[in-house]
Amino acid sequence: MAIKVLSPQLANQIAAGEVVERPASVVKELVENSLDAGATRIQIDIENGGSTLIRIRDNGIGIAKDELSLALARHATSKIASLDDLDNILSLGFRGEALASISSVSRLTLTSRPATQNEAWQVYAQGREMETTLQPASHPVGTTVEVANLFFNTPARRKFLRTDKTEFAHIDEVIRRIALAKMAISFTLTHNGKIVRQYRSAHDRTQKLKRVAAICGDEFVQNALEIDWKHDDLHLSGWVAQPTFSRTQNDLSYCYINGRMVRDKIITHAIRQAYADFLSPEQYPAFVLFIDLNPNDVDVNVHPTKHEVRFHQQRLVHDFICQGISNALHSEQASLYQTNEACVSANYQVEESAQHEYRPSYSKPNRAAAGQNIFDSSTTTPSTALFQTNKKNTQNRPHFSTNIPATRISKTEQAAYSALLSNSEMATVLPQEDGALLERKTPSILKALALVENKALLLQQQQQFYLLSLQQLQRLKIELSLQRDPVLQQPLLIPIVFRLNPQQLTYWQQQKTFFTQIGFEFHENLGQQRITLNRVPSCLRQQNLQKCIIVLLSQPLDTFSHFLTTLCDVIELEQITVYADAVTLLTETEQLLNQKQAIRLSELFIELNWQAYLEKM
């Protein structure tokens, strides 16, 4: 077959295959047009699930008479005019494809009147030919679009439509999503002449919470934590549900970029990562999130239905979202919103800047992002329970090197291993003479045999065997790293701002030299009782820095050793599940030891006595 240029009619029907998937797609495109036209009231009338009639009526600016026919032409739009406009899109629509695509698979009537005209005009088009008829009509300022007999000329598409109930459920979900994003707009949705949804315009907090409750349910609002998180041009706001309000299906997840509803993999991953410590893979978080950023930093022209976007700085956006949600989830003082309340619980001081409020929060392990997170924990007593996380059940299985046969551990060794795990203090090897102790410090005569239940290394030195706790080994490595001269530092991508209460300020004056000594770099603003964290020790880069600092500043630590011990107790340790990683940890720790510190490693060894076991053989 020879190559030919497709006719406009065929091209429009092909485009309709991308834009018009089902009646809900038509509703989405037309309601977004109404929003772009500045409408404050939008009515959506549906008959028979949208297959018979879809009518969208708004009070927007309207379309002039001489532009009505042009509005149905393909690639005709008032929203962009140049390539520069394409890089700076804030409108919901911009391609000029929707009306042309819809009219090519339906009988479409467009009636409109701008405020500058005394009378309204109506244009009608149907099917493949798309010939338009213009005539006067009676209509208030605004626009009405009627789409009748959807897919009447494409039977193959029409037979794929589901039942009226199913198709209307999809339309209802589209309106719910749009209504969450556009709180100031009133929406009325009818089906077969009956009002199904009616969302009044919401301007203050009480009204907005009522709309969220109407769409997401009262239980969501009662378990929701508010987020208001800013950094430069990035702004994250909305509500996230507490982990206890998890879902078995992904039915309460609403995310918007500059007011546009999206389903983006980067955002989804960031949200899942923020909830990783709280939810299992079978559980889903519930959230309503609004992300606002410079339109130049996001490309919305990457998907036929505009459901996906592409960020120019994906890592920054990912970390910013993850950090903001983590802060809310980890904050003991996060506010629970009640359906009959319009304000958050006043358990803490709120930092106000311009017209935004910043919520107190703690972060999960630093994802290379933090924002203007300003808080005051004057009413909080440090508690270890605050920082506990749900550990996932893992299958504990010993890992052995390839050249070492697997052997069964006797009850004697199991008892010694249990003692190692139950003892939170550093274990000391007592029945050793100085010569043997010094000999054991030599790395060359130590052999790492196996990883035992992902918690300890089984070591051999000549005829002696030892268990070495991986948790204690990790703490020792971090402690040694913080005592290096100089300490390796890394700058924070987004500085963390702390607002201190008087008690914390006192402890800060006491401990700030200790912070500097181990590689932290703060900027002080004592007049406003603020400190800003700018640089951190490299070994703590992935730690929950806010949690660590709050714990340190909540108690008197008058000596450096006490300060360092407290910090090492707070840090979150990595779960090591691979034998090679455990050996690497041991090697890196040994490299940090100097001659005076060599005994520190030996003190962690628990000797295993095989003699009683061997005598029974």
UniProtKB/Swiss-Prot annotation:
SMART domains in the cross-refs: DNA_mis_repair, MutL_C
InterPro entries on file: DNA_mismatch_repair_CS, DNA_mismatch_repair_MutL, DNA_mismatch_S5_2-like, HATPase_C_sf, MutL/Mlh/PMS, MutL/Mlh/Pms-like, MutL_C, MutL_C_dimsub
UniProt keyword DNA repair, yes or no: yes
A molecular function GO annotation: ATP hydrolysis activity
Domain of life of the source: Bacteria
Annotated GO biological process: mismatch repair
Function: This protein is involved in the repair of mismatches in DNA. It is required for dam-dependent methyl-directed DNA mismatch repair. May act as a 'molecular matchmaker', a protein that promotes the formation of a stable complex between two or more DNA-binding proteins in an ATP-dependent manner without itself being part of a final effector complex.
Protein's name according to its UniProt entry: DNA mismatch repair protein MutL
Originating species: Pasteurella multocida (strain Pm70)
